[in-house]
C-alpha cells in the first residue's frame, strides 16, 4: 500500500529504536489524500491542524493553487481497527535487527494514553525509552531495542554511533528529510527532565 502513517515524537534520537506505532483504540482515524499528493493515516481530530497548515505553506510556495482542499478523506476507522496493521520502519538497520529477534515488531498497537491534544494521534513506540512505551511493549510483547549505551551515546547499530542522544536529534531529522520520510519538524517548547545538580538532560531507560 502506498500510504504513510503520520506519527510524531518529541525525541527524534529514539526513532532508530522504534518497534511499533500506537493509536487510541476509541478515537477516529482517517486515510486521506493530502494536498501534497501523498496518502496518510492520522487522527480525524487533528486533520485540520496538521494538514491545513501544510496546505497553507504549499500555497505560499506556489506549489498548489489557493483554495485547493487540504485533504480528501478516503476512509475512516476506529483506532482499534488499525491494530496489527504493519508498516516499513524508518531505518533499514532497525528492520534487520528486529528480524533476528523472536518477537514481531513494526505494527500498530492501541492504548488509551494516546491523546488528541498534540501531534497526529499516532505515537512512535520505543519500549526501551519512556514509561508509556515500556507499558505498551509489555502489553504486546514487542521487541526490546536499545541503541543507546550506558553513557547516553548512540550505539554502532545506528548511523549515529558515538553521538550523545540529544546531539543525534538533528542528524536523525536531516537523514529522514533526505530519505523523504520527514513530514515536518516544528519547533515547540515542552518540559524535559534535567539533573537537579548538573542540569544535564536525563534519559529514561527501561
Question: Where are these predicted regions, by residue range?
Answer:
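Residue patterns forming the tRNA-binding/recognition surfaces of aminoacyl-tRNA synthetases
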Residues: 1-16, 28-30, 36, 84, ...
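Catalytic alpha/beta core of large soluble enzyme barrels
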Residues: 17, 27-29, 35-149, 177
Amino acid at each position: 500500500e502506498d500510504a504513510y502513517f503520520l506519527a510524531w515524537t518529541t525525541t527524534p534520537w529514539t526513532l532508530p529504536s522504534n518497534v511499533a506505532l500506537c493509536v487510541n483504540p476509541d478515537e477516529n482515524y482517517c486515510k486521506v489524500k493530502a494536498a501534497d499528493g501523498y496518502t496518510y493515516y492520522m487522527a480525524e481530530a487533528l486533520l485540520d491542524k496538521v494538514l491545513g497548515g501544510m496546505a497553507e505553506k504549499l500555497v505560499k510556495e506556489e506549489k498548489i493553487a489557493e483554495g485547493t482542499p487540504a485533504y480528501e478523506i478516503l476512509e475512516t476507522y476506529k483506532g482499534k481497527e488499525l491494530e496489527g496493521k504493519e508498516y516499513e520502519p524508518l531505518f533499514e538497520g532497525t528492520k534487520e535487527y528486529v528480524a533476528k529477534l523472536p518477537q514481531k515488531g513494526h505494527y500498530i498497537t492501541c492504548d488509551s494514553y494516546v491523546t488528541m491534544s498534540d501531534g497526529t494521534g499516532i505515537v512512535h513506540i520505543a519500549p526501551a525509552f519512556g514509561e508509556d512505551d515500556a507499558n505498551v511493549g509489555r502489553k504486546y510483547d514487542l521487541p526490546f531495542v536499545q541503541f543507546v549505551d550506558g553513557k547516553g551515546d548512540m550505539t554502532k547499530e545506528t548511523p549515529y554511533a558515538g553521538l550523545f542522544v540529544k546531539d543525534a536529534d538533528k542528524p536523525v531529522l536531516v537523514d529522514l528529510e533526505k530519505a523523504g520520510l520527514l513530514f515536518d519538524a516544528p519547533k515547540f517548547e515542552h518540559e524535559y527532565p534535567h539533573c537537579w545538580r548538573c542540569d544535564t538532560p536525563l534519559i529514561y531507560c527501561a
